[in-house]
Amino acid sequence: MILGIGNDLVDVRRIERTIERFGDRFLDRVFTEAERRRAERRSAAGPHSPRAATYAKRFAAKEACAKALGTGLNKGVYWRDMGVVNLPGGRPTLALTGGALERLRQITPPGMVAEIHLTLTDELPIAQAIVLISAVPAPQP
């Protein structure tokens, strides 16, 4: 059962300019420590740097997730409540905390478990994320 779908496009140049202008103030407000560690391993050299693209994809993922949750970035859902993480095989997903996790619990029907599916891509200067939140029957003991 699909609980929510969200999609977002971000101009990598916009994220690059925002980082140049606000630096750590922006990065600390929007991204989790794990996201920052991953992005900071990427090269910051040149226009449309891999570092900026990494941040842009994660920014788009947060926007898409907030849309899939049906709240946008309000109603107690904040940027750092949603963090892009990678599963052991490398596939990206979102780890939710705080208000985002609470909203996920609210929209998940009893007896079901929510699953978050995330796809990220970029074709410079655009980064895109699509989030699909589904509910599947909870495992039986």
Curated annotation (Swiss-Prot):
Cellular location(s): Cytoplasm
Binding, Mg(2+): D8, E63
Sorted UniProt keywords: Cytoplasm, Fatty acid biosynthesis, Fatty acid metabolism, Lipid biosynthesis, Lipid metabolism, Magnesium, Metal-binding, Transferase
EC number: 2.7.8.7
Gene Ontology biological process terms from the UniProt entry: fatty acid biosynthetic process
Catalytic activity from the UniProt record: apo-[ACP] + CoA = holo-[ACP] + adenosine 3',5'-bisphosphate + H(+)
Single annotated GO MF: holo-[acyl-carrier-protein] synthase activity
Predominant location: cytoplasm
Cofactor entry: Mg(2+)
GO cellular component: cytoplasm
Role noted for this protein: Transfers the 4'-phosphopantetheine moiety from coenzyme A to a Ser of acyl-carrier-protein.
UniProt similarity note: Belongs to the P-Pant transferase superfamily. AcpS family.
Protein known as: Holo-[acyl-carrier-protein] synthase
